[in-house]
Amino acid sequence: MVQHKTNRGFRFCIFPGYNWCGPGCSGPGAPINRVDAACRDHDLCYQMHHNRCECDQAFLHRLRPLINPYTQEGRHARLLYNYMKLQTLFTCRF
């Protein structure tokens, strides 16, 4: 995990170099790949919608086709997918 100093304190980006994946890791900057773009869209969905479960479901659908054990991006997609799938079992029950 990478720590970046911000005006509000530290933020935690799950993967080095990513701009949008992780608690408090919401930009700035363009996404560096499709996984980072999915994280950005998930963050924006949370900001614009009250139904977080719909945002989480959309995030899972976006990550699933990106999973690939032979690429770093695909492995990151798998890690985020598995984490979110587990979290939604408790928070959204799907």
Question: Language-model features: where?
Answer:
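Extended terminal accessory/targeting regions
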Residues: 1-94
